[in-house]
Amino acid sequence: MIKIGMVGVSPGNGHPYSFSSIINGYDPDGLARSGWDVIYNYVRERDRSDVGFDDAAVTHVWTQDSDETKRLQAACKIPHTVD
């Protein structure tokens, strides 16, 4: 298993959400609350078999804002946050 850490966010850049949701799958309610409607709609239109990797997972997340970290964790099924 390849373990991936998602580190940081930047304004206007939803890649932490899109990459994490594609790798881990996503929680529909959590992703809907993330504020990234474009990403939410994109992954919802994909077949579930297009989302997730058997040999990789985003296991840890840290961002500059603890509330953002919690939103990303909830949206993308990331088990651990880093302070």
Residue positions per predicted region:
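N-terminal Rossmann-like dinucleotide-binding module
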Residues: 1-73
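Short acidic low-complexity segments
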Residues: 50-51, 79-83
